């Protein structure tokens, strides 16, 4: 037994005597005594009781290196006090210190211990000062002190002797005074202080200090941000001031700072010295902005307030508003017009050396096609417009954007209704007309007949002293087509067509559609400027940025010059065909203009709604009494939507009207099916098909979906459906009369009237009218008809019969029964 154990043994014996009665000792000392007793018993049997440090390490199943404080390998053996492997002079071979000695030592070394710990690298700590060891020891000392403080509060007067005796034992600090607690807490805070931006990690690797964030401490981030801000301020100061400060009302200090390249703080200081106290977000008036500009010795000029939504102002510019020095020659824009099937597309097909006509439904053009052809290294832009009467608006659009109109007239047909309409459109647009008399390859045709007819519409040929160029051609064989192109270039040279490629690009929408994968797709014809990919653009009531741009042959373009037809994507919605487009300064301006135009259009549509007045009351009530055919129109392009909707509205059937609930570009989707189901509408699809779940939904919800690729078929079938909506008109037809002469009453059958057919014929399915003294008593259906005892289908004049009237048993002798039927009168088509 060692000397330390001998010293400890009397204390154990003393505690055993004191614990004979449990009520004599406090709970804290009973726990202490139990711990000492178990320890002494273990040592008496040769068992070595581990210390507190060893207990914690065994519980965690991790051994630590005493020199570094890190987790040691599995084969590492800890060094215990008194072992041969303990280094000389280490704390493990030193005699155990009393509590007062430890406190004096800690108070002397606390200041010198903290500084090396702060400077120590987390992976290479100073000897005997590793964070793990210090943290663990301080935690144990603090717990001992806390236990001693609570014990002294209860037993301050009775156990001072025991506290001094236990000072050198295992629980030496357990009964120390409360003053030690404050010192231990202070020492614990000092020793566990770590460098900024680090923290201790719990677990076996506790004590390894790591960075708290990927970018270091917040202080370093603040310093870096301040440095960047200072660099930006210096860069602004290095930039020269503008000569003129162009401002608009409502600008704030931030807006002014961006224009004159100065810091916001600097401007606020100047305004404060000038007697103006504002913040950076407060709007400045014109006087304040001019005062600030004068302080910077620059001129202030207010911008004119321009309505960004008024894009039509760009098309109202005269020759005086255009810089003539920047104008260059451009390709002529030629529109091919004429009656249906007169050979417009065939002519263009020959020019392009493609076969467009064969691929078009019904062999007719149903949308505007924009293409380019080359002759003698010069480009000509062609627009092919439909000739059917339904496409009046599309022909008008083609005439409004064109330089020259090619009027195609078939030599065998002559002047037709759409030919006359095309002439009027071209004359209204004030464009020169070149007449192409087509189909001269047909035997027996005479082009002079066409020339004589055209003179009635002020189209006088040059040989008769007029200015109209006329060229007989054959689009099928190509005869005289080159001569026609030469006439086009000659006319273009006479017109001296020029444009400014450096101006803001503007033009018109030829066609628009909704593509499933690409979104809104618009075919544009550039009239001024150069359109580039990425330009912010306003198209009618829509806006966006040019995402992609292709030419007529689907080749991708980065830029397009005037008179070039292009197909673009990137718009937020499908625009209307015929709308103008303009490139804006920024996407913000484009968005503002597009949204403003859309809002105005919505307000105009709302204001143009039908208002019922005394003057229109009768017609409004008449419309409400009419049968309605509700339609939903979906087509592939905007021009087809307009043409089909206008044609359907023109169908006139007395008593029935067309109500188009919805007309849009794109495939038939689930929303269209739901709308049709709710409103009982018929869906008309033109060159489109149901997509996704729409087809299945239409079958399940019994929605009528009609699909067409020729406009004639759509119009004819809708007209037939409208005629079918009329209520049939019936006319009464008298069949015969019966004079009642005798009555037979049966309990199960009722009253049977016996009589004689005095006129006509009585059938078993006829309606009957009971007349008594010239007054109709009952009008209903014949119940049964008998001749003798047999049921018969009819009884002719002069024969007796027996009959019953359904739901009526009050016949009397002398009544007259009239038999009649209702026949439907066919409505006139």
From Swiss-Prot:
InterPro entries: EF-G-like_DII, IF2_II, IF2_N, P-loop_NTPase, Small_GTP-bd, T_Tr_GTP-bd_dom, TF_IF2_bacterial-like, TIF_IF2
Residue span of region G1: 338-345
A GO term for molecular function: GTP binding
Residue numbers spanned by region G4: 438-441
Record's compositionally biased regions (Low complexity): 81-113
tr-type G domain boundaries: 329-498
Superkingdom of origin: Bacteria
Keywords recorded for this protein, A-Z: Cytoplasm, GTP-binding, Initiation factor, Nucleotide-binding, Protein biosynthesis
UniProt-recorded name of the protein: Translation initiation factor IF-2
Species in which this protein is naturally found: Oenococcus oeni (strain ATCC BAA-331 / PSU-1)
Protein encoded by which gene: infB
